[in-house]
Amino acid sequence: MIKKLLIYFVRFYQYTLSPLLGLTCRFYPTCSEYMILALQKHGAMKGAYLGVKRICRCHPWNPGGHDPVPESTILSKEKSVK
């Protein structure tokens, strides 16, 4: 439930405020898309943490570039066991 609400707020930002601000994100995927992917992959708590951490790195002194959402640690452990 919280995850869906957070995704709704990010989508609201993407459709209302983001077009007014222009392309300012230094990363791919953009910070807002990263937040949605992190929420979908990791849930509300860890996804929000990863998203906020990413937004804090998005500033003029960071070179940016490709920065994918990390894989879930549970899935990584399951893959390494098999």
From Swiss-Prot:
Localization per Swiss-Prot or TrEMBL: Cell inner membrane
Entry membrane topology: Peripheral membrane protein
Keywords from the UniProt entry: Cell inner membrane, Cell membrane, Membrane
Pfam families xrefs: YidD
Keyword DNA repair assigned: no
GO CC annotations, alphabetized: plasma membrane
Keyword Kinase attached: no
Leader peptide range in chain numbering: none
UniProt cross-references to InterPro entries, sorted A to Z: Membr_insert_effic_factor_YidD (IPR002696)
Domain of life (superkingdom): Bacteria
Region (Disordered): 63-82
Function: Could be involved in insertion of integral membrane proteins into the membrane.
Cited NCBIfam families: membrane protein insertion efficiency factor YidD (TIGR00278)
Family to which the UniProt record says this protein belongs: Belongs to the UPF0161 family.
HAMAP family the UniProt entry points to: UPF0161_YidD
Protein name according to UniProt: Putative membrane protein insertion efficiency factor
